[in-house]
Amino acid sequence: MDLTLWTYEGPPHVGAMRIAASMQGVHYVLHAPQGDTYADLLFTMIERRGQRPPVTYTTFQARDLGGDTAELVKRHVREAVDRFQPDALLVGESCTAELIQDQPGALAQGMGLTMPVVSLELPAYSKKENWGAAETLYQLVRGLLKQQVPAEPKHDPKRWQQQGRRPRVNLLGPSLLGFRCRDDVLEVQTLLTMHGIDVAVVAPLGAGVEDVHRLPEADLNICLYPEVAESTCLWLERNFGMPFSRTVPIGVGATHDFLVEVHTALGLEPPSPQEGYRRSRLPWYSESVDSTYLTGKRVFIFGDGSHAIAAARICSEELGFQVVGLGTYSREMARPVRAAAKGLGLEALICDDYLAVEAAMAEAAPELVLGTQMERHSAKRLGIPCAVISTPMHVQDVPARMSPQMGWEGANVIFDSWVHPLMMGLEEHLIGMFRHDFEFVDGHQSHLGHAGGSGASQESALSDVPEADEGYVVWTADGEAELKKIPFFVRGKVRRNAEAYARQVGCREISSETLYDAKAHFKA
């Protein structure tokens, strides 16, 4: 067990709460002590919802452990059913309650309730939040549809042609506390409608029990978020023969591939590759002279699997960036992330220790970081611009306005979010030229991605560190002053080159002259 101040994912019962809160008419009875009710704040403070999640806690205390906690579970189940009258009931336990082995799901299933009861067994000490969300959705769909499973799974995704209607698809995976899920659903619905494709059911976000029963009526399932929906899509494919799309439409290229995959599966003519150029501003800008100075920028990417893989493709294929680091905290997505990293000549970082991620980030020395809320903090300490691309996130990454990541408009949002921190670097450099003015000190810099005074003080402090080994070099005062004249977004690269040159020629101090010599050496 590790003691930490940050975790990328909560325990699996938080994932179950996300599914219950995303749906209509579903209630979750959670066997948990009083201290485990903190998760409510995630929905009211981060997601900024107007209502609490539909969760009833048993809230047992230490004195209850000497009595019959099983009866406590039954009482809370009855009270929840009488009060909320749900269409389906989820019953599970938190990480703490798992230790006392009350098996609340089995207790609830033996109470003879009239609505479907889904027992959730979520191993809190080996699995985490995204797995818990995926398992909850899978168990709920499986429990509600088990009576509808045909003897032989026969499903023709092109049957809409014989039935004289438009093709229908299900969007699976969007949930509360997902990254821009609400906006992604609206954007993908708009995108599909433009191509003559109707959306039958969106689940779990906004879906009810009756909607789940209608899932097999669609022609195709679309797996928008593999972390949450892939296991459900695989079950529907095995038992109902329903195919599903595997391309996540984040970025111009991925959106086009997504449309081609969906159209091909439904028997429609694939759209033109030029559609992205007409609908999104990203392709034009990345080919324009204005973006030339952004070409080759070093980018470090870390987040959930789907968004990290999509970001790597956008950076390498659409914006001309150089990906110098790629990783995820989601072990369930380790295989596709490793494959994406291998295609870029990298070794993927599969890790849920934020300190190890920060160390890898510092070693890669990127000029832009794309990550989670924690990478924003780490990048700020290192003086590197950052954009958040994935959960976990803070309230500023849950905008009230529409801000999707998927589809053509999502590509525009990504274009703004990722390029602006680098564009702001030019302004910071100009401000740095007027450093003597009291209004333009390091601590007053204008965007969150820059470390400000802490970054500058960290750099100057390096010159005060005593000699550690033979390869250690020291920066003189005039060398540091000259280094500060270089724009911050390439300063790290210049520092590394100068130190490498000094070691190569046997110089123990780096002055302004050494810096000029290093510049000439690497340009030769």
Swiss-Prot record:
Its cofactor is [4Fe-4S] cluster. The keyword Oxidoreductase applies. GO terms for biological process: light-independent chlorophyll biosynthetic process; photosynthesis, dark reaction. It is an enzyme of class 1 (oxidoreductase). Pathway: Porphyrin-containing compound metabolism; chlorophyll biosynthesis (light-independent). It catalyses: chlorophyllide a + oxidized 2[4Fe-4S]-[ferredoxin] + 2 ADP + 2 phosphate = protochlorophyllide a + reduced 2[4Fe-4S]-[ferredoxin] + 2 ATP + 2 H2O. Component of the dark-operative protochlorophyllide reductase (DPOR) that uses Mg-ATP and reduced ferredoxin to reduce ring D of protochlorophyllide (Pchlide) to form chlorophyllide a (Chlide). This reaction is light-independent. The NB-protein (ChlN-ChlB) is the catalytic component of the complex. Protochlorophyllide reductase is composed of three subunits; ChlL, ChlN and ChlB. Forms a heterotetramer of two ChlB and two ChlN subunits. This is Light-independent protochlorophyllide reductase subunit B. It comes from Parasynechococcus marenigrum (strain WH8102).
